[in-house]
Amino acid sequence: MKKILFLCLLVSVLSWSCSESKRKINESVVDFEQDSLAGNAALPKVTFYQYEDSSNFPDAILELYTPLGNQVFRPGKVPFEFNIKNFSYFGEVSQNPKLFLIFNGGDRIGFFSPIFQRELTEGTYRVAAYLVDEDGYSLKSFGNYIDRDFMVGESRAFPYSAEPYIALNLPTNEQTLLLGEELIIDFLVLGGDMKLDELKVQIAVNDFKYEVDHMAPVRVANLPLGEYKVNVKLMRTDGKELEGPFSAVVKTVYIR
């Protein structure tokens, strides 16, 4: 009996230690603005927060050999060839892909191999490619991600722009979460540095708003049942909006 009590105590201590190893930062509790919810004191407050930075695989490198910049392909199967370095986790057997691509600000698409083909129709494409950790969150160190513009068929290149833009790993469009689950907003900023370029990311989940000044997953707790528009926008710290087509992403999320 004493052994059982000791083991239970040990498990509790270890669980507490693990939870304490991740410290919440930038926590923001948001009051309800909707009349139907504002008067319900029993509802827990919607809370945005992040965990302290703990960058995984900072030495992992993702290289893109094909397509080349502004390369033109015929409609149909377009080849992609990546080279992945210092990321042994990619070679492990898993049911979850470690390499993801986002085409023109759409939902992420996972791949198990660094060499593959993708069926694409005529158009101009910007692909953001990145590696993810064991939890499916994008790696955010320099070299963990890469982007490239290319064309399929009779299409024109994107107008030149030196503006940074955003790629949204999570959530995916029409993602459904159970009541009590946290909404994870995981993004990458490409073509710029949030500190050096004085950038911030503004997040709006319906009427609930939050801002961050660095790349780290944002967690939203205590969302009530309903449908939510998740608007993630990259902008200057002085409030000036960027003009590029991929500076903002909108997804629909359901809490059931």
What are these regions (language model features)?
Residues L14-S17:
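C-terminal motif of bacterial Sec signal peptides marking the signal peptidase cleavage site
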Residues S19-S21:
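Bacterial signal peptide processing site
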Residues N26-V72, G153-T176:
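Short, compositionally biased P/S/T/A/G/V-rich stretches that sit at domain boundaries
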Residues F73-F80, K85, L177-D186:
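Short coil/turn motif common to extracellular beta-sandwich-like domains
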Residues G105-S113, D207-M215:
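Short beta-strand segments within Ig-like beta-sandwich modules, predominantly Fibronectin type-III
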Residues R118-T124, V220-K229:
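Surface-exposed, short loops/turns at beta-strand junctions within beta-sandwich domains
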Residues V132-S141, Y210, M235-E243:
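Short acidic/polar inter-strand loop motif in beta-rich domains
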